[in-house]
Amino acid sequence: MSRYRGPRLKKIRRLGALPGLTRKTPKSGSNLKKKFNSGKKEQYRIRLQEKQKLRFHYGLTERQLLRYVHIAGKAKRSTGQVLLQLLEMRLDNIIFRLGMASTIPGARQLVNHRHILVNGRIVNIPSFRCKPRDIITTKDNQRSKGLVQNSIASSDPGKLPKHLTIDTVEYKGLVNKILDRKWVGLKINELLVVEY
């Protein structure tokens, strides 16, 4: 299954708020939400919706998500927490959480177009796994800095998670530590995703 490129607001109406997918919000009084919420929810449907939330928020394919669940299952700690830590430590998500891009697909595009450096080296793989003490910067040219400058100016510094710090003057971000569960930017029950 390929990455979703269709209408984003339809997914938000169906699954709820997905801040990584888009900044847009649906109009209130939507008939679509009422249509899908009527009646009793089945257990399978609840699990499927939680999995789809995770997939669409982080912009993953089905195969990528299964691979992350498999890696998290091998860990000795809680599978759900390890899964969220793996997804939150992806380079495209770190750039989004630092405020260098307005959405995760926008952050993925910055990485693919080689505007981002990790520890002084160009990285063009959005799924690159960041580690504590990694320094994320932009290229030293005006075009790269201009792309990031607009996003940083419009982002809210109060929403920056505790495991990240950013220097808005030099457009430099630092990963301080591994993420805690309470700082995940998405309301989700990760155990239902693992059970699915």
Curated annotation (Swiss-Prot):
Subcellular location: Plastid, Chloroplast
Residue intervals of the S4 RNA-binding domain: 89-169
Annotated GO biological process: ribosomal small subunit biogenesis; translation
Protein keywords: Chloroplast, Plastid, Ribonucleoprotein, Ribosomal protein, RNA-binding, rRNA-binding
Recorded GO MF terms: rRNA binding; structural constituent of ribosome
Family matches, as SUPFAM superfamilies: Alpha-L RNA-binding motif
Protein's UniProt name: Small ribosomal subunit protein uS4c
UniProt source species: Stipellula capensis
Main location: plastid
HAMAP family: Ribosomal_uS4_B
Disulfide bonds: none
Biological function: One of the primary rRNA binding proteins, it binds directly to 16S rRNA where it nucleates assembly of the body of the 30S subunit.
